[in-house]
Amino acid sequence: MLENFIANQATKEFSVSEISNKIKELLENNFGYIKVKGEISGLKIASSGHAYFNLKENTAILACTCWRPILAKIKFPLNDGIEVVISGKLSSYAGNSRYQLSVDNLQPAGLGAMLQILNDRKARLEKEGLFNKIRIPIPFLPDKIGVITSITGAVIKDIIHRIRERFPTRIIIWPVSVQGENSSNEIAEAIEGFNNLAEVNKPSVIIVARGGGSIEDLWSFNDEILVRAAYNSKIPIISAVGHEVDYTLIDLAADKRAPTPTAAAEFAVPVRSILNNTLHSYEKILLNNTSRLIKYHEHNIINYDKIHRYLSHYMDNRQQLLDETGFNLLDALLCFIELQETKIKSFSKERVNPAKILNYKTLELTHQTAYLSKSANNTLKNFEYKLELNSTLLASLDYNNVLKRGFAIVKGETGNFLSSKIAAANEKIFNIKFSDGEIKVVRN
């Protein structure tokens, strides 16, 4: 086409603007959308926000223009000396008779350049504190699990299979691109989207997953916007990007890092069979401990009953002794009074200063009466004290008080005590005594 244009227009006269427009048309129509790899040099950013630089290789130079909207989408700082791959269209600028590449997309090229960008970004975000947040614990039994990954491929299948195999739980999938120019924005929006759901629909934990790949393939997971989304998430995040040897910046901002997507599923839920076995073990231990405790208290109740019967018999004997002592003291007092009255009568017959003798004997009688009364009262108080003390001891050992604390006595139909499950195996009728009464229970 270019040769035809030259042949057809060789003798025609052009104005400067005409030839410039023709050259522009030829460049744009013949090259279209291209990719060019080279090293940035002579970078200048105008006050308008547009960037102008050269892309060089050895002695060859290609002028490039990166307009402000495109520059704002670039996820790393541009500097002289960085090797990049640029996609765009060739055009010409009539102002200085040169052709240039209008940038549509710009990515770092070469492992060294990418690692330098990654290390610089990591240091900056670490200084900001995005990797030092307080980690949110992963819930033991999440009711819902959010998974952010590609809807196609083996990763989502492995996660679903592993969760269903270990402990079936509701899975909410948010499909995203895991590679490419806009993938980091999609993943960040998915994290924010899960956090903005209503509480009833919000997952308990989020898994961000992708299979293995090169540093270029995993580059989206080093994006600053994605790191900030993980840092700000109120839902715990498990990152599972690549293989065990692959590390991305989202791993440092997540609440837990899994070496593989399958491992992330294992971190999210326990194994149901192991959990059931553990619960059965705890149940067995609890039943054994409860059985031992019941037997211990049954033994105590039987002992308390024996002590109660012994003390009841002892108190009855003491009460009888106290009554007999009281009767004896009363009889002695009456006999003494009668004796003194007899003496008084005999003295009254003697006529020897009867008034004096009467006063003396009356005083003596009063003293003796007071002594006997005091002695009797002391004896009675002593017995009453012992009686009260023994009654208190008896009440503390009374098995009825034990029943009031929530225990019960189980007897068989014949009145025999049943202290274990084995002892009750052949019984059909049970008498259960509580603190406030007794009930009869018939086994179906």
UniProtKB/Swiss-Prot annotation:
The keyword Heme does not apply. Keywords: Cytoplasm, Exonuclease, Hydrolase, Nuclease. GO terms for cellular component: cytoplasm; exodeoxyribonuclease VII complex. It is an enzyme of class 3 (hydrolase). Its EC number is 3.1.11.6. InterPro entries: Exonuc_VII_L (IPR003753), Exonuc_VII_lsu_C (IPR020579), OB-fold_nuc-bd_dom (IPR025824). Its main location: cytoplasm. GO terms for molecular function: exodeoxyribonuclease VII activity; nucleic acid binding. It holds the Pfam family tRNA_anti_2. It is found in: Cytoplasm. CDD domains: ExoVII_LU_OBF. Signal peptide: none annotated. GO terms for biological process: DNA catabolic process. It catalyses: Exonucleolytic cleavage in either 5'- to 3'- or 3'- to 5'-direction to yield nucleoside 5'-phosphates. Belongs to the XseA family. PANTHER family: EXODEOXYRIBONUCLEASE 7 LARGE SUBUNIT. Heterooligomer composed of large and small subunits. Bidirectionally degrades single-stranded DNA into large acid-insoluble oligonucleotides, which are then degraded further into small acid-soluble oligonucleotides. This is Exodeoxyribonuclease 7 large subunit. The gene is xseA.
